[in-house]
Amino acid sequence: MSDKLIIFDTTLRDGEQSPGASMTREEKIRIARQLERLKVDVIEAGFAASSNGDFEAIRSIAQVVKDSTICSLARANDKDIARAAEALKPANSFRIHTFIATSALHMEKKLRMTPDEVYQQARLAVRFARQFTDDIEFSPEDGSRSDMDFLCRVLEGVIAEGATTINLPDTVGYAVPEGYAELIRSVRERIPNSDKAIWSVHCHNDLGMAVANSLAAVKMAGARQIECTINGLGERAGNTSLEEVVMAVKTRRDYFDLDIGVDTTQIVPASKLVSQITGFVVQPNKAVVGANAFAHASGIHQDGVLKARDTYEIMRAEDVGWSANKIVLGKLSGRNAFKQRLQELGIELESETEVNAAFTRFKELADQKAEIFDEDIVAIVSNEAQHDANEHFRFISLSQRSETGERPHARVVFSMDGQEQSGEGEGNGPVDATLHAIESRVSSGAEMVLYSVNAITGGTEAQGEVTVRLSKAGRIVNGVGTDPDIVAASAKAYLAALNKLHDKAVQKINPQI
């Protein structure tokens, strides 16, 4: 009988630590719901003690997600753990993930604690967490650089206190597959009560080996949980890619002999959603979810695939959620047909007000382009989801004037705290003029660090999706806007980013696990 491999998704916690990938509470809820449809086992929804925003996001996710275990990170102290437990209280099933550094460098320089003090604090933290749940994960931060004897002593102690999952992270992405697997195997063999816990891996991709390291630990060292993110999202070079480890284990079941509960048909929808919300574009040749993952340009390959797909395809595109663009609705389609298509796409809107707003935007788009695709509907919902009661800026309209040999001029009308504003500006091009027009009324002082345009579907009528990344006072935020008019999409994206900058969120604690 095969073992179960647990998929622990940390897109909303570790993935969000990518510069510019910060998400609003509503965006996190949308991703959490998609992760639930994906049937991941555990969703690490955030770090409750790091900010009030994280606390509220975790609590909201715990209220709406019912089929996945919801997890919060917590430092090894009573205050953090109690805060995590409070945020997780509404969940059907929840886990507390606590951690403390165990390397000599971290203990001396960061914690300013002796090894004995760290050992006692780790044990007491797990003991305290047991008051709230039996599902407790422990991570020794910088464990791969810790003294082996001390690391084993700490892990044996926390298992004795009731830790049910032990996670050994490759914090800085330095490990290689054989060495990482050997570390975990050695630790498990040296700890007499290692069989009382599930062993987990959490790898970073600095050397491009996060997936290989994770799979080596599973195959060679008995790890039975992989911590990963959608699209490999994460700071620096990212984390272990969920789609890659899942499809490796699924496709090579003959080698791994493990069961996995993920609904793989939801992988591509999850990838697209995370990319759209964060603005981190998926590279075309990315395994599983890249646009070219199932494309064959070679004539020999094309001929082989046409005759028998398994000649060059080791998995089917539809098995991971890829499908051809499909015309689903048009300008004559009614509200019920629109709601039905939302359900078929797995999109859940919380209220009739949200449905009405999305339907209104759909009808506006249908007047502009004849054919409405699934990707258009997803973009509509994503765009509407950015609007909330606390929204500071909102796009209303745009007019432009541009003639060859003259500097373009733009006039942008938008609301600021409910009051209509009108700004005018000139620039080197229509987009530059439009953003100058907005800044003429806002004076944000932000620096643009990224501007990118992507066509949502094919054809000249396609909606443009614009991503804008702004930096100010050490904060980096991301905004996305969609519209058949690229310049209007740019204005929407810029205002969306300004909304995030306007949110006076306190500085979050971002642990390196």
Curated annotation (Swiss-Prot):
Amino acids binding Mn(2+): D14, H202, H204, N239
Protein name: 2-isopropylmalate synthase
Stretch list, region Regulatory domain: 394-513
Free-text function comment from the UniProt entry: Catalyzes the condensation of the acetyl group of acetyl-CoA with 3-methyl-2-oxobutanoate (2-ketoisovalerate) to form 3-carboxy-3-hydroxy-4-methylpentanoate (2-isopropylmalate).
Cofactor: Mn(2+)
Catalytic activity entry: 3-methyl-2-oxobutanoate + acetyl-CoA + H2O = (2S)-2-isopropylmalate + CoA + H(+)
Cellular location(s): Cytoplasm
Organism: Cupriavidus necator (strain ATCC 17699 / DSM 428 / KCTC 22496 / NCIMB 10442 / H16 / Stanier 337)
Keywords from the named record: Amino-acid biosynthesis, Branched-chain amino acid biosynthesis, Cytoplasm, Leucine biosynthesis, Manganese, Metal-binding, Transferase
Family: Belongs to the alpha-IPM synthase/homocitrate synthase family. LeuA type 1 subfamily.
Lineage start: Bacteria, Pseudomonadati, Pseudomonadota, Betaproteobacteria, Burkholderiales
Subunit structure: Homodimer.
Any one Gene Ontology cellular component term annotated for this protein: cytosol
InterPro entries per UniProt: 2-IPM_HCS-like, 2-isopropylmalate_synth_dimer, AIPM/Hcit_synth_CS, Aldolase_TIM, LeuA/HCS_post-cat, LeuA_allosteric_dom_sf, LeuA_bact_synth, PYR_CT
UniProt keyword Metal-binding present: yes
Gene coding for it: leuA
GO biological process: one example: L-leucine biosynthetic process
Molecular-function GO terms, alphabetical: 2-isopropylmalate synthase activity; acetyl-CoA C-acetyltransferase activity; manganese ion binding
Protein EC: 2.3.3.13
Residues covered by the Pyruvate carboxyltransferase domain: 5-268
Short name of one Pfam family: LeuA_dimer
Pathway note: Amino-acid biosynthesis; L-leucine biosynthesis; L-leucine from 3-methyl-2-oxobutanoate: step 1/4
Enzyme class, UniProt record, top EC level: transferase
